[in-house]
């Protein structure tokens, strides 16, 4: 299911939508550090990232064609989490990820709010 974010109106359907992205300088420094110290670097991708963030605004969507509830064909669905296509999806995902990493004792970078680090013994998680 994909929301029709193009129909959303700023100030009415959504407020803050800015979501920080990794600074290129942070990526360069990380890669230089890994290369200099001959370390292994692992990368991950969260495929359903935009489906995990809780939504703070009230958003209703129509029932998708072919999936209408036969008892209530004219009803709409109230969203509890963001969907692909909503303007607030990137920010909701960032906030969800940030809260999770902070609970796991990661620290937010001072110059880059997308840089989270955690040191455990000799290991550094970035």
Language model feature labels by segment:
Residues 1-126:
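Long, low-complexity, charge-biased intrinsically disordered regions
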